[in-house]
Each structure stands twice: as C-alpha cells, then as structure tokens.
A protein has these predicted regions:
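Rossmann-like AdoMet
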Residues: 1-75, 79-129
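Conserved small/polar residues in nucleotide/adenosyl-binding loops
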Residues: 131-134
C-alpha cells in the first residue's frame, strides 16, 4: 500500500493488514510455526500445557452443570498442535467429548489448510468471522 500522504491507521487495522493481507500478510504467506518457522508455541514443545488446558476445560464444564451442548472455540489454532492434543485428552472424558462442539476461528487460508490436514477425521468446525461492527 503506497501513499504520498500520512494516514492515521488504527492499531487493529494495522495488525490486520500486517498479518492477513492477501498478498503480503505474515500468516498468509507461510506457516511460521515449528522448527522451520519463526517461532515454536508451547503445544509444540510439550503436551503438558494442552493437557492442563483440557483438564481445566472439563472441570469448568462440570462446574457449570455438565451442559449437553458446549462450544469450545480456539482462536488462531496455528498448526493445530493444541487442538490435536485437546481432542486426544477430551476423549478420556466421554460424556464431555459427546457434548463438546470444537471450533477453530482462523482467518488464514494457509493455516486453515494445515489445520485440516493435521485434524483429518476429527469433528472440528472452522469459522473465519465472529462479528462485524460495520
């Protein structure tokens, strides 16, 4: 985006352009995760973090009365390492797993493709828009 004048750009729009611009966005161009990427996230180092999150989620679900329908949304699932471990952990709690609808909010088509490959045969749903204020 080239301009000859100074433009006030709100931070959220700057971040959105930097990360998700269709031509040059950071998460659009490549997979930045893992040993070949720019950084490694906790689920890629050890299962422990994701397993602890899973235990907390199941505990929370029980504390609110074990509802028959429960949505769990992961925002920006990266290479799906956490969701993969969450699913494995949730399967150890069949009543919870039966009630849980797993959703990934992902804007990047590149990462969504990686996630779908990693979570093949998993009952996960994807969304790319939560709401709009316009």
């Amino acid at each position: 985006m080239k301009t000859d004048k100074i433009v006030n750009l709100p931070l959220d729009k700057f971040i959105n352009i930097s990360l998700y611009n269709k031509k040059s966005g950071y998460y659009i161009k490549k997979n930045p995760f893992g040993q070949k990427g720019d950084f490694i996230t906790a689920p890629n180092v050890s299962r422990l973090f994701s397993e602890m999150i899973a235990i907390w989620v199941v505990s929370f679900w029980k504390s609110i009365g074990s509802p028959k329908e429960f949505n769990l949304i992961e925002l920006g699932a990266g290479n799906a390492a956490m969701m993969k471990i969450l699913i494995e952990s949730f399967k150890k709690f069949p009543s919870f797993f039966k009630s849980c609808r797993l959703v990934i909010y992902e804007i990047s088509p590149t990462l969504k493709k990686i996630q779908k490959k990693e979570l093949l045969n998993s009952d996960v749903n994807w969304i790319c828009l939560l709401y709009t204020s316009d």
